[in-house]
Amino acid sequence: MSELSHVTEAGDVRMVDVGGKPLSRRRAVARATVRMAAETARRLRELPKGDALATAQVAGIMAAKRTSELIPLCHPLALSHVQVSLEVGAEGVEITGVVETTAQTGVEMEALTAVSVAALTVYDMAKAIDKGMSVTDITLVEKTKEPA
């Protein structure tokens, strides 16, 4: 079990000590897709609950900032940049999240959390008119680290 950084030799979980690591510029990009009927995709800005795209964008940004409260072993980070964009296509919405910081640990969980919560927000807001939606392809597409 020792190759898992969050698990001790005894099998206990822990938050990794990053105190001795130097500060680095960190960036992560994640994506998620919400598949839906074409008619649903056309109506996303005019749903009974309101504009799903604007709401999901804000929800994703808020989620990135609260990742350490949602995922127990994540470090709380001061994020310098969060961007969530939603692109509507005929078969649904592709969500991209970009997160940046200067810290001792990466921001991939923040980017993944941003797109996941944005996708769930789209789903929540459109579920009344489309019972066949699915959230798919939540993935990390880029992770970079440069000296600060």
Q: Predicted segment positions?
A:
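C-terminal binding/interaction regions
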Residues: 1-75, 79-148
